[in-house]
Amino acid sequence: MIEVTRETKETQISVKLNLYGKGQAKIDTGVGFFDHMLEAFTKHAHIDMEVTCTGDTHIDDHHTVEDVGIVIGQALREAIYPVKSIERFGNATVVMDEASVTCDIDLSNRGFLVFELPIGGKVGEFDVELVEEFFRAFAFNLPLTLHLIYNRGKNKHHIIEAAFKALAVSLRRAVAINENAGIPSTKGVL
């Protein structure tokens, strides 16, 4: 079990993570919709993850969402790197009712984000612009190359949840053990 903590003047975060788990989640960030997305991610990535966060949500949820992305990325970095004997690449298209989102990832040890989800406004009290902030923090702290591409959909909740689940399935596929892969790069290092 990997454990990473981070404490700033804005947030206090602890993440415990087992990369090859059973999809068990214990999430408490103080942001209900975000907790729901992280639970979906954990379940479909087949990782076990505990996240606790105390943040300055009396201001807004920005610091909590972004900083949790940082710490989850750092925990996954500890669990995955150096990359050896895994697939490295993963992709998935996930649908949720009318919504469809495609995710492509490369455990390249290079942070990069392509975020093409046409969402704005709120889901309940949650500012959906924070979704991109989470994925950026996640991608650059893991680090990995992450593309999230909108295919269709109208319901913001469904689009966002499809994105989190697509990332989960892509990650599960990328970290699948392949003893023949060695270091999956022509460079000999990632």
Curated annotation (Swiss-Prot):
It is an enzyme of class 4 (lyase). GO terms for molecular function: imidazoleglycerol-phosphate dehydratase activity. Disulfide bonds: none annotated. It comes from the Bacteria. Signal peptide: none annotated. Keywords: Amino-acid biosynthesis, Cytoplasm, Histidine biosynthesis, Lyase. GO terms for biological process: L-histidine biosynthetic process. GO terms for cellular component: cytoplasm. Belongs to the imidazoleglycerol-phosphate dehydratase family. This is Imidazoleglycerol-phosphate dehydratase. It comes from Sulfurovum sp. (strain NBC37-1). The gene is hisB.
